[in-house]
Amino acid sequence: MSATTDAGQLAAFHRCSTAEEYFTLLEVDYDPRVVAVNRLHILKHFAGELAKLPEAGADAANPRHLLHDYRDALVRSYEAFTNATALDHRLFKVLKDRAPKSAFVPASEITVERLGSTQPSETSEQTEEAR
């Protein structure tokens, strides 16, 4: 691939607007069913991966290196959703807000009731008193 082609491909990268365009341009194989279900999550993860990359200014002279980094970031983002679900990653606020809370129970709150330790008449009386 020539430097001109790399520069053109980098310019095309900046014009991409769909997940499929990114996959096609960066030549990443994908399952359309996975993308259909996780499109926004993959793109959000991809944006986060791109943000972690070093500043592009240093690589502007080497678009091939930059495109390689972008491809690796897209592969990581796609694989994140082939190995786990959107609920596992919780990238969006609506999912983060609904994250399950840990159910911590201190040991002092745990009690053990033994079967047959109460008399049936006592249990009946307690039930009637509760009404």
Swiss-Prot record:
InterPro entries: NifW. Pfam families: NifW. Keywords: Nitrogen fixation. The keyword RNA-binding does not apply. The keyword Cell membrane does not apply. One of its GO terms (biological process) is nitrogen fixation. Homotrimer; associates with NifD. Belongs to the NifW family. May protect the nitrogenase Fe-Mo protein from oxidative damage. This is Nitrogenase-stabilizing/protective protein NifW. It comes from Frankia alni (strain DSM 45986 / CECT 9034 / ACN14a).
